[in-house]
């Protein structure tokens, strides 16, 4: 078996220069996300979401980005889940996107708000029928005695709602309002390119960071 310490890769794909980067980090993010989609990477909108636990410990998991606009980055979940409870207590989060084939990472920090009920309703109704049933059947993050119990709950939801499934009040979207966005491009000898944007009032300040 290969020693973990011997696993390494040298990055040589391209540079990230100030002259090539957008002044607005949201615009720059859209450009990089488009590159990831066009490269047909698996789950290009997958991101690590880190929250502050109720006990002060950090918690992280993968979720899917579902919208990005000038305000921030939107994802959806059960408000009663662990992350939902953590965001209610500490409405701050960090996101990380990793596109290995492009040798790129984006790191985001910011405050978090729930999106409007109308926005959550619109997205919920766009989901596949099975996913809408699942939002009612799953008591996310609670202890499950057996998978059969979940199947029984799903069958009950199907029988009750059929194809007319409303959005549960405990399910909806969050928007991460970024205060920091950092773009990382892998380079040889671990001398990576890092451009960091920090929110300063109504504009962004961009600096280059040591790798």
Curated annotation (Swiss-Prot):
Residues bound to substrate are 8-11, 66, 123, 127, 131, 190-192
Catalytic activity, EC: 1.4.3.5
Summarize where FMN binds, as residue positions.
61-66, 76-77, 82-83, 105, 140-141, 184, 194
Q: How is the cofactor bound?
A: Binds 1 FMN per subunit.
Catalytic activity reads:
pyridoxamine 5'-phosphate + O2 + H2O = pyridoxal 5'-phosphate + H2O2 + NH4(+); pyridoxine 5'-phosphate + O2 = pyridoxal 5'-phosphate + H2O2
Q: Which cofactor does it need?
A: FMN
What is known about what this protein does? Catalyzes the oxidation of either pyridoxine 5'-phosphate (PNP) or pyridoxamine 5'-phosphate (PMP) into pyridoxal 5'-phosphate (PLP).
What this protein is called in its record is Pyridoxine/pyridoxamine 5'-phosphate oxidase
Q: What gene name is listed for this protein?
A: pdxH
